[in-house]
């Protein structure tokens, strides 16, 4: 997301796997006392804003049962995406650490579809 936001015209497409929309819950899960630090979401990474301003083809892949970054974060990124051509792929039954193994076929098909779209096939 950082590269897509910084260099949107140099990116032909964007793939986000297990991306987070909100920094505060993730930091808390990682043991950061966000309240003690006075952390506010608008001081975070701004991933929703970044994805909102990227208009290129976008594929968001997220595990249905992600125990680190909830599927709702992937949905939020998809909903905020400014792309006309976008897809949210939910990998059924997968969690954060086995997303690729659980969804190999659909994962690869989605990437092939994005590449085909970019290449105009």
Residue spans for each PLM region:
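Catalytic active-site module of serine/aspartate enzymes centered on a nucleophile-bearing elbow/loop
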Residues: 102-121
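Catalytic histidine-centered segment of alpha/beta-hydrolase-like enzymes
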Residues: 68, 94-108
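Hydrophobic/aromatic beta-strand patches that form the interior of the parallel beta-sheet core
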Residues: 15, 59-61, 89
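Structured catalytic core of nucleotide-sugar glycosyltransferases
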Residues: 8, 17, 73-75, 88, ...
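Hydrolase active-site cap/lid region
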Residues: 1-56
